Regions:
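Alpha-helical multipass membrane-protein architecture
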Residues: 39, 72, 82, 93-97, ...
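Alpha-helical transmembrane segments of polytopic membrane proteins
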Residues: 53-61, 149-154, 237-238, 324-327
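Membrane-embedded translocation segments of transport machinery
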Residues: 189, 196-347, 354, 359-409
């Protein structure tokens, strides 16, 4: 009971109340008038694409460069904590939680669907003179997919966690988003200005969670529909969201060392089992070759891609893909960054940056290439059918891939 009272004493009651009421109002609006919410989202999409696309692209690119460079400066040897502190979690637990925090339903949802979508249409096909659905288009499709899940996205998480970890563990400030702005606004972080900063961070995370839960609900519902032939209703999808939310809440309430650590380690073992199955059941030689060639292709193209701005007036493709991804990564930044800081106390800045960027990117690339190369091979050299599956229902793409593997059990 004393622990509960101690935790409650740290809660900002006015901010929590205001935030809760605003979230309830926003969710109520979604249920009562989803068309209005769609129009609101479409308006902001157009506004960002038309006026801020270049700015967003450059900010993410420069954040990536800065975050990676700081690891190799003298500051890289500083610890996120006192100089004699050591990490709380083992490297395996740390890596598992990092991977689980930043990659969830999205990488499963888009692992097949994204490269197959890019195989049909993307602006780089005309730039490089490649025909849709060709082998050259497959290389470009894999490259773009890796770019969207690569260094740039993870740097958006890492920089937030780095700022929070530094100011919280070395300067004694609260582990909240407002602390990252202490060098700019000083002690105003303890007043209304700080509350507004945290409020914006909460809403940013809300939008990120909305996208992730939507993708996850669609993925799980489509899987059940595909396997059992049942018709999925909106109420069923809502039930899926509620179940996932309850599991996540129980995990958080049970604490880092129990719930979240257990789920993260279980998650990474399940990922390894599924990866191994696809690797050996699929075109193994093609996958292994793609792991090498795809990674090298990404390394050679990541800088020009990071600064590429869609020159078209409508920016339809970049709005649907690159700008969507960068907005999604940034929206999750406050939450994931804070979590990264929480589990990284005692590690050096160099270890933190490399651990929160290089390791998740490497694991993510293995996943994306194993699934992506398998899907592209099935479409180009196998029975085909994935283009039609993605165009019909993007959430069923991964299940159609399993079926087309045609494993003889």
């Amino acid at each position: 009971m004393q622990k509960i009272y101690a935790r409650l004493s740290l809660v900002n009651i006015p901010l929590t109340f205001v935030t809760t009421m605003m979230v309830v109002c926003f969710l109520s609006l979604i249920f009562m008038n989803p068309e209005l919410v769609d129009e609101f989202a479409a308006f902001w999409n157009r506004l960002i694409a038309n006026y801020f696309a270049g700015y967003l692209i450059w900010v993410v690119a420069l954040v990536t460069i800065f975050t990676l460079l700081i690891a190799f400066t003298p500051y890289g040897s500083l610890r996120l904590g006192k100089d004699n502190e050591r990490p709380e979690f083992s490297r395996f637990s740390w890596f598992s939680m990092l991977f689980g925090a930043g990659v969830g339903t999205g990488i499963l949802f888009f692992g097949v669907a994204e490269p197959i979508s890019h195989l049909q249409n993307n602006p780089f096909l005309s730039i490089e003179g490649a025909e849709p659905l060709s082998s050259e288009a497959a290389v470009i499709a894999q490259r773009i997919t890796l770019f969207h899940w690569g260094l740039n996205g993870w740097a958006c998480y890492s920089i937030v966690g780095l700022c929070l970890g530094y100011f919280s563990y070395r300067k004694g400030l609260p582990l909240t988003i407002r602390s990252a702005l202490h060098p700019i606004i000083g002690d105003k972080i303890y007043g209304i200005a700080g509350d507004l900063i945290d409020l914006v961070a909460v809403f940013s995370t809300l939008f990120g969670i909305t996208v992730s839960l939507g993708l996850g609900a669609s993925q799980m519902s489509s899987g059940i529909e595909y396997l059992f032939g049942t018709t999925i209703t909106p109420m069923f999808k809502l039930s899926v969201v509620l179940v996932v939310s309850i599991i996540a809440t129980v995990s958080v309430v049970s604490g880092l060392k129990r719930g979240i650590k257990f789920l993260s380690e279980t998650n990474i073992w399940l990922c390894l089992i599924l990866l191994s199955f696809i690797l050996f059941a699929g075109p193994t030689i093609v996958i292994l070759s793609s792991l090498f060639s795809g990674t090298l292709d990404y390394i050679s193209s990541v800088i020009p891609l990071s600064f590429w701005v869609d020159p078209s007036i409508e920016k339809t493709w970049s709005t649907s893909w690159t700008l969507f991804y960068w907005g999604w990564w940034i929206a999750w930044g406050p939450f994931v960054g804070m979590f990264m800081a929480r589990i990284s106390r005692g590690r050096t800045i160099r270890e933190y940056v490399l651990g929160t960027i290089i390791f998740p990117v490497a694991i993510g690339f293995i996943w994306l290439i194993v699934f992506g190369a398998t899907a592209l091979h099935i479409q180009s050299s196998g029975p085909g059918g994935l283009v039609e599956a993605v165009n019909e229902d993007i959430s069923q793409a991964v299940f159609r891939t399993y079926e087309l593997l045609n494993v003889d059990w």
